[in-house]
């Protein structure tokens, strides 16, 4: 986490470079990561990996019908969760973001309830497994069609900007999303209207 006094200025004349041509570190700022904060980030990443492993067991034992493995995504997901303000900012996730959901504060009981379509699921089992959402945390319910959440994310971000709410919209997606029309529609809408 970069300290507030060391944030980057967007749209500078020179490109912002943190790594040199030979791979050397060029960044001249301290990170605000020490002690308990580092332990909390590590715990959240470990919990995300363990959740992913449990989901894999559920599919292999036939207890659920769909999973989207996310091993290796933990650091990015936990970083997003700790960089935003849960319940104020908005997250538009894709189906591999169960670690992000957990780190934001969606209870394990709800995540497993959603995965197994039990009464612990806020949607009462009416949503496909691995598609959680949380109204309280502004965690947009995951949609199955790849990239279909990008246009709503762009629209939400533009409305936040116009209304000057101070909120942020975060949209995550995999590389396959960039081959979809919805992705291009959302990116174009954000570029033209944003």
Which sequence ranges carry the predicted segments?
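Cofactor-binding active-site loop characterized by glycine-rich and histidine/acidic residues
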Residues: 50-53, 57-193
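Charged, compositionally biased N-terminal leader segments and the immediate start
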Residues: 1-30
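Alpha-helical protein-protein interaction elements
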Residues: 3, 10, 33-34, 47, ...
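Positively charged, low-complexity intrinsically disordered leader regions
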Residues: 36, 40-41
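Asp/Glu-centered strand-loop micro-motifs enriched in Gly/Pro and often flanked by an aromatic residue
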Residues: 30-32, 65
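N-terminal glycine-rich anion-binding loops that anchor highly charged ligand groups
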Residues: 10-11, 16-21, 43-57
């Amino acid at each position: 986490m970069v300290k507030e006094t060391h944030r980057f200025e967007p749209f500078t004349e020179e490109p912002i470079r943190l790594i040199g041509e030979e791979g050397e570190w060029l960044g001249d700022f301290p990170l605000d990561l020490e002690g308990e904060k580092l332990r909390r980030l590590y715990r959240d990443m470990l919990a995300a990996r363990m959740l992913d492993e449990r989901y894999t067991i559920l599919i292999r034992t036939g207890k659920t019908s769909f999973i989207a493995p996310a091993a290796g995504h933990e650091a990015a997901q936990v970083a997003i969760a700790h960089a935003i303000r849960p319940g104020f900012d908005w997250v538009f996730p894709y189906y591999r973001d169960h670690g992000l959901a957990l780190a934001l504060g969606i209870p394990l009981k709800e995540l497993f309830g959603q995965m197994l379509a039990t009464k612990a699921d806020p949607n009462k089992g009416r949503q496909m497994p691995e598609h959680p959402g949380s109204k309280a945390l502004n965690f947009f319910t995951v949609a199955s069609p790849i990239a279909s959440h990008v246009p709503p994310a762009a629209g939400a971000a533009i409305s936040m900007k116009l209304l000057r709410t101070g909120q942020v919209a975060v949209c995550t997606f995999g590389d396959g999303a960039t081959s979809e029309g919805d992705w291009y529609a959302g990116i174009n809408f954000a570029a033209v209207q944003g």
